[in-house]
């Protein structure tokens, strides 16, 4: 999803990310230079993603604001959607895998607990356990348009509507996923050299800013 959407974000829009999985997934891909991005990492928790998105969107009602977050972060802050000032320039991509997927992948220490991860760490099964109607009905009853996808084909079918530049209606686009697929995607990305390529690009950009002497100084500090 990040790969498909990142390069297609409308020029001049803004995008807010949930922490960890949402932010990391998009970090592997470039977004247009005119797009501003933000993430609520101050407290390093799930709180406040939707509230921050709403507040920013209120300041610039003529500008599109996108939000990308997982189900736990969404349900933690879902009361923000009921705010009477909720605008028509907000697009929310809700990645619903039914748990805190972050704790199940191989890079997280939590994965060593195996079958105990879901019930005791990843909060699996809460909030409707990937109900197909819970978020849909909540959004529609608040006057927010709803889209959903349970496959790549369905996601691509709804993607253009989600990215439309009309600022006369807001969307919640709920994509149902499986943690096993997300974890495999992460494993493939981190083992194909893409991460190394990204690090090299970052290194080159930093070098262009601080120069050779600056890079040498940074290397001495890191040693």
Segments the model singles out, each with a brief description of its role:
Residues 28-223:
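Thiamine diphosphate
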Residues 1-22:
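Active-site pocket-lining segments that scaffold enzyme catalytic pockets across diverse folds
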């Amino acid at each position: 999803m990040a790969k498909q959407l990142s390069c297609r974000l409308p020029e001049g829009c803004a995008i807010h990310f949930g922490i960890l999985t949402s932010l990391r997934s998009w970090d592997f891909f470039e977004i247009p230079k005119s797009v501003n991005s933000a993430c609520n990492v101050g407290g390093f928790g799930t709180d406040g993603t939707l509230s921050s998105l709403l507040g920013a969107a209120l300041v610039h009602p003529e500008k599109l604001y996108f939000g990308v977050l997982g189900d736990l972060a969404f349900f933690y802050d879902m009361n923000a959607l009921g705010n009477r000032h909720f605008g028509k320039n907000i697009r929310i991509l809700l990645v619903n895998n039914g748990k805190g997927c972050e704790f199940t992948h191989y890079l997280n220490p939590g994965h060593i607990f195996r079958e105990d991860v879901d019930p005791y760490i990843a909060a699996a099964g809460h909030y409707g356990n990937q109900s197909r109607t819970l978020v849909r009905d909540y959004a529609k009853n608040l006057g927010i348009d709803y889209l959903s996808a349970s496959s790549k084909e369905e996601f691509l079918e709804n993607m253009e509507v989600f990215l439309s530049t009309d600022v006369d209606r807001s969307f919640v686009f709920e994509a149902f996923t499986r943690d096993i697929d997300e974890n495999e995607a992460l494993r493939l990305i981190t083992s194909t050299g893409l991460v190394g390529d990204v690090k090299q690009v970052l290194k080159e950009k930093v070098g262009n800013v601080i120069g050779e002497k600056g890079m040498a100084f940074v290397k001495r500090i890191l040693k």
